[in-house]
Curated annotation (Swiss-Prot):
Localization per Swiss-Prot or TrEMBL: Periplasm
Catalyses which reaction(s): [protein]-peptidylproline (omega=180) = [protein]-peptidylproline (omega=0)
InterPro entries according to UniProt: OMP_Chaperone_SurA, PPIase_dom_sf, PPIase_PpiC, PPIase_SurA, SurA_N, Trigger_fact/SurA_dom_sf
Domain PpiC: 175-277, 291-390
Listed name of the protein: Chaperone SurA
Molecular functions (GO terms): peptide binding; peptidyl-prolyl cis-trans isomerase activity; unfolded protein binding
């Protein structure tokens, strides 16, 4: 599951989209004095932060402003996002998570590169848009901090068994993939009967305006959904059956493209689900994937308290000279190599990809011709000499497919678990809103109430 354990470029690109708006912030030159719009435990959200975040969202809908919800609803959605970011950053700091200046600078360099400019050029663009560079740096630092919090959450709580991978692989090789959208009307934990009734009325009202053709599903998602991906039209991306909760999977298989089902009741609230389109998973799989593997053997001389650097280097040089003088590599390895894992096998490492023992070791192996022996080189383990025995092309399609499926299942579990974690974090926090909130159903059409059952389908990374 390393794919979602590391900070990926998409995170940086997402940040760059948020903080480089299309429309100029100079339109907001005459701003009132800053004030607090929300108190979040020991932190605050300022009006300037909220205005800037709303402006950035609107800039991504230039020419499609009709898809946005009313300003007061958008304000509530964006403010809730900012509150969750504050809570996650605070929890990360409590957990000892820190973002170094080097990591932050690297992220900002990537953002600048994505915008086809230098860091200085990026700074000038931000200033021209009315955004101070220190504020931008802090925003990027917060984004990375939140990512590290999710990363640690995944490492400590998410487990994917080989059996789960086997089942999902069988489905992927014989099934379809489904492009889904959803709309969520959320419910708090321990919701009262009155809260449930209000949520049912709201979700049925949303379904009614969609059925009547008054709003497209995408526009309704942006306008009314409580899901974190509401402003992305509730898009859940492409999913195979293993990525869909069991309570929904059977139903999705019977749906036709364009069909909408729901309301469906789950632990997060009520939701509507739309099947956008279906595709053959084998068509999406792509060509077979081949990789070069190497067969080699090596001799290792370790550096220890008793065997210092100079002694280890002198010993490896002596062994290299013996082999150059005609001694058998395997015999020398059995007699003198200090790698207990393979010295008895004459230092044989078997077949391996070039990065199996680190990039530097792999580069030395790749630089050799078959049968040749390297000069001594240093690694973290000590001093080596290596003999390359052969190369081969290996089909790693299935291995990579298993890794991708393992990542996909892990990501689905992470989304489900992290969504629950965020709800708990929000419910346990002291949050005082210093801004007028619109009523939940102020802009939401109503309809007759009919209960529904089902699971929760969380937002997921698009494929």
């Amino acid at each position: 599951m390393t794919r979602y354990f590391s900070i990926v470029l998409s995170l940086l690109l997402a940040v760059s989209c948020v903080f480089l708006p299309v429309a100029s912030a100079r339109q907001q030159q005459h701003q009132p004095l800053d004030r607090i719009v929300a108190v979040v435990d020991d932190n605050v959200v300022l009006k300037s932060e909220l205005d800037r975040a709303i402006h950035n969202v609107k800039s991504q809908y230039v020419g499609h402003e009709g898809q946005l919800p009313p300003d007061e609803v958008l304000q509530r959605q964006v403010l809730e996002r900012l509150i969750l970011i504050k809570l996650q950053v605070a929890r990360a700091q409590t957990n000892g998570i820190r973002v170094s200046d080097d990591e932050l600078n690297q992220a900002i360099s990537s953002i600048a590169e994505n915008n086809k400019t230098s860091v200085d050029g990026l700074r000038q663009k931000l200033v021209a848009e009315g955004i101070s560079f220190p504020e931008f740096r802090q925003s990027v630092r917060d984004e990375i901090t939140v990512h590290h919090l999710r990363q640690g959450f995944a490492q400590s709580r998410i487990v994917v068994s080989e059996g789960e991978v086997d089942t999902a692989l069988a489905q992927a090789n014989s099934g379809a993939q489904y492009h889904l959208q959803h709309i969520l009307v959320s419910l708090p934990d321990g919701a009262t009967s009155e809260q449930i009734a209000i949520a049912q009325k709201k979700i049925n009202g949303i379904k009614s305006v969609i059925d009547k053709g008054e709003l497209a599903f995408s526009a309704a998602a942006v306008r009314y959904s409580d899901s974190p991906n509401a402003l992305e039209s509730g898009d859940l991306g492409w999913r195979s059956l293993d990525e869909i909760p069991e309570a929904f999977a059977q139903m999705v298989q019977t749906m036709k493209p364009g069909q909408i089902v729901g309301p469906l009741r789950g632990t997060s609230g009520f939701q509507l689900l739309k099947l956008v389109e279906v595709r053959d998973s084998t068509a999406a799989a792509g060509p077979r994937q081949m990789a070069t593997e190497y067969h080699a053997r090596h001799i290792l001389v370790r550096i220890t308290d008793k065997q210092k650097e100079a002694q280890a280097k002198a010993k490896i040089d002596t062994l290299r000279a013996r082999i150059a003088g005609g001694a058998d590599f395997q015999t020398v390895a059995r007699e003198s190599s200090e790698d207990a894992n393979n010295s008895n096998q004459g230092g044989d490492l078997g077949w391996f990809p070039s990065d199996a023992f680190g990039a530097d070791f792999g580069n030395h192996v790749k630089a050799l011709a078959d049968g040749n022996v390297s000069e001594p080189f240093r690694s973290a383990a000590g001093w080596h000499i290596v003999q390359r025995l052969g190369t081969r092309q290996t089909d790693v399609t299935r291995e990579n497919q298993r890794a991708q499926i393992r990542d996909t299942i892990g990501q689905r579990k992470l989304e489900e678990s992290y969504e629950r974690f965020l709800r708990e974090l929000r419910s346990e926090a002291y949050v005082s809103l210093q801004i007028e909130e619109p009523a939940d159903d102020h802009h939401t059409p109503s309809a007759a109430v009919t209960p529904a059952t089902g699971a929760v389908l969380p937002a997921a990374t698009k494929h």
